[in-house]
Amino acid sequence: MDVCDAWKRESPKQKSRVEGLAKDSGKLVSAEKLKVVWSEMLKSEVVPDAESVSRIINSYGSIGDFDMISKILRLIQLKDAEILHDIFRLTISCFGKRGQLECMDCIIKEMVSLGYSVDSATGNAYVLYYSSFGTLAEVEVAYGRLKRSRILLEGEGIRAISFAYIKENKFYALGKFLRNVGLCRRDVGNLIWNLLLLSYAADFKMKSLQREFVRMVEAGFRPDLNTFNVRALAFSKMSLLWDLHLSLEHMTHESVAPDLVTYGCVVDAYMDRRLARNLKFAFSKLNWNSAVSVLTDPLIFEAMGKGDFHSSSEVVLGNSTNEDWTYKRLIDIYLKKRFRSNQIFWNY
């Protein structure tokens, strides 16, 4: 009897057996043993579900037997083409999460050869996996394929590719990528603009940073906490106190609440200029008795690092069970610590 004709009846017992065989396949590394498992599944007279077939395919992928994968996919297409798209999706996801990019590419090629198109979810996942496990050059190729497919790169993909550039300190290339994605996209909020500002701030290109900030506002985008903190970190590291002060005023005008990063930028800038006594004036427009929070995008730290006050405060907060911390209290502790360290230095 033909295999396709045999898959007609299904009972809970048979289905359970098929699922058990599929799970067992994940533990096998021998092609011969896998063939035995696949043959048993065919004889069960049950059409395997997408997850079970995906397990078998992933097992074959781990030993590099793509001919067998192709045979399995074409057999499923003949019998139950409706589940084939789910099989592709699950298999691509499984290979991608394990960093088996070559296997993932082979599955996508097989998918296209069988007449299935790559949808938005699969295309974006493809880029994410390359961003996680591939080289920067491979990431750029993956994005190029997505772009040619006219699939819109979603926010998670934008962040992943941006992180790949940041890891390599390729800030100019990051800016080019973001412009290619499109600065006018509103479906991802301020993400693209904030990352563009970050690409200039990380290279301390202050004139370009200011110019693009003005363009962002003129384009109708309202600055958020990440926008202000990218600029504040750059101003702080460059000891541009007046620019930092103006940024805080703008922040207050926009009703954007500062976080630990914002306060840290001010503290570090004033401490570097030996102006600790002026901190009370610096915070006159802010409520430093408010509860501590850290809401800044972690990608910003990857590019700019964390300031001394921020890092020191995280240690204090991490070692404390008290949840009622204010910025003023953290600043007092930090100033005492710096005062003691300076005393020890001069005593030596």
Question: Positions of the model-derived regions?
Answer:
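Residue register within tetratricopeptide repeats
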Residues: 28, 32, 63, 67, ...
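Pentatricopeptide repeat
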Residues: 1, 12-19, 34, 49-54, ...
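C-terminal interaction modules of eukaryotic adaptor/scaffold proteins
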Residues: 272, 276-348
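Internal alpha-helical scaffold/solenoid segments in large eukaryotic proteins
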Residues: 120, 206, 217, 225, ...
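Short coil/turn connectors between adjacent alpha-helices in alpha-solenoid helical repeat scaffolds
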Residues: 4-15, 19-30
